[in-house]
């Protein structure tokens, strides 16, 4: 690990933020701090993560949602002080790192299949438990 990566790791540890493990295709809710006049409130932004870019402190992710029939994309820096929290609503099964093709899709064609988590399948028994 070079000195720049070491400094970034120290700064990330200093921020003390818990970032959930999410990938492109996952539906996430990003709670963003919005300043209106002299007061601050938290606004939820829910959509599909279509890309993650960068690394370390400069990493960011793009969230796409459909608002009143219009596609809206927003890029969030992961370690931004304006982000209150990130929550993963559902995991998507995709085979690409960048889902920009969703921009051209509408309705059912833009749906992403849900990813089945390993070990959470009901009704399946392990061979050791069956004996």
Swiss-Prot record:
Function: This protein is located at the 30S-50S ribosomal subunit interface and may play a role in the structure and function of the aminoacyl-tRNA binding site.
InterPro entries: Ribosomal_bL19, Ribosomal_bL19_CS, Ribosomal_bL19_sf, Translation_prot_SH3-like_sf
Name the record gives this protein: Large ribosomal subunit protein bL19
Gene giving rise to this polypeptide: rplS
Region (Disordered): 111-131
Biased composition range(s): Basic and acidic residues: 111-124
HAMAP family, A to Z: Ribosomal_bL19
Entry keyword annotation includes Ribosomal protein: yes
Keywords of the record: Ribonucleoprotein, Ribosomal protein
NCBIfam families per record: rplS_bact
Xref: Gene3D superfamilies: 2.30.30.790
Cellular compartments per GO CC: cytosolic large ribosomal subunit
């Amino acid at each position: 690990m070079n000195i720049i990566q070491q400094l970034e790791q120290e700064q990330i540890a200093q921020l003390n933020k818990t970032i959930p493990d999410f990938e492109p295709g996952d539906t996430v809710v990003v709670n963003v701090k919005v300043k209106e006049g002299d007061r601050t409130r938290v606004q939820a932004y829910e959509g599909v993560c279509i890309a993650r870019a960068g690394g370390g402190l400069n990493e960011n992710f793009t969230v796409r949602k459909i608002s009143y029939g219009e596609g809206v994309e927003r890029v969030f820096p992961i370690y931004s002080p304006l982000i209150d929290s990130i929550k993963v609503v559902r995991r998507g099964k995709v085979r690409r790192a960048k889902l920009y093709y969703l921009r051209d899709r509408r309705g059912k064609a833009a749906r992403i299949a849900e990813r089945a988590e390993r070990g959470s399948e009901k009704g399946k028994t392990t061979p050791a438990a069956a004996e």
